[in-house]
Regions:
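Flexible, low-complexity linkers/stalks enriched in Thr/Pro that connect modular domains
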Residues: 55-60, 135-140
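Solvent-exposed, low-complexity, repeat-rich "mucin-like" stalks and linkers
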Residues: 1-12, 61-92, 141-172
């Protein structure tokens, strides 16, 4: 802070600016209202009415929030999501990370895109620009098909073949056995080696091997 100063004139002594006594308690490190006083007396001891200047030291700078970790973040459905958090710094208050308010609607049980928001304000009420993190909950895990019955299966020509089937489970959708597509070219009238294939995909398009 550089004070602009004052001038003083006297009808008898003329310009007595150099005789002004200035007193100031301004502390630019601390927000507050301060006073600068100006006093002067002429050569004959006549004191001027004290003049004061009010100096307001303010903090109007908004804090800055910095995300930690990935943005966007991707997590497999069903996994545990631990937010990486954020830090917040303020020119006046310093580190105000502990004051961050985090709001999250992440549901790891449901595939989708979610948002985590981070807000903070300093001691003087200056609010940071809200920072957001996008969290994508995805399902990339393949279903698993489990055969029932024997493999390989041996039949006599002319026997009736009833396929034992298979089951299918998915980490996200659960039991998807009913979605299995079975393709078979078995002809029990003709000796040979045949293949029965089982395919399934979950609701998110992940196809079993």
């Amino acid at each position: 802070y550089t004070d602009a100063g004052a001038t003083a004139t006297d009808t008898y002594d003329g310009d007595i600016t150099s005789s002004i006594v200035t007193q100031s308690n301004v502390d630019i490190a601390i927000v507050g209202t301060y006073t600068v006083t100006y006093d002067v007396a002429d050569a004959n001891g006549n004191a001027a009415i004290t003049v004061t200047r009010t100096v307001n030291v303010v903090d109007t700078t908004v804090p800055v929030i910095t995300l930690l970790g990935d943005n966007p973040a991707t997590i497999e459905a069903g996994d545990t999501y631990t937010d990486a958090g954020a830090t917040a710094t303020d020119t006046y208050d310093g580190d105000i990370t502990s004051s961050i308010v985090t709001q999250s609607n992440v549901d790891i049980a449901i595939v989708g895109t979610y948002t985590v928001t981070y807000d903070v304000a300093d001691a003087n009420g200056n609010a940071a620009i809200t920072v957001t993190r996008t969290v994508n909950v995805v399902d990339t895990t393949l279903p698993v098909i489990t055969l029932l019955g024997d493999n390989p299966v041996t039949l006599e020509v002319g026997d009736t073949y009833t396929d034992a089937g298979a089951t299918a489970t998915d980490t996200y959708d659960g039991d998807i056995t009913s979605s299995i597509v079975t393709i078979s070219n078995v002809d029990t009238a003709i000796a040979g080696t045949y293949t029965v294939t089982y395919d399934v995909a979950d609701a998110n398009g992940n196809a079993a091997i």
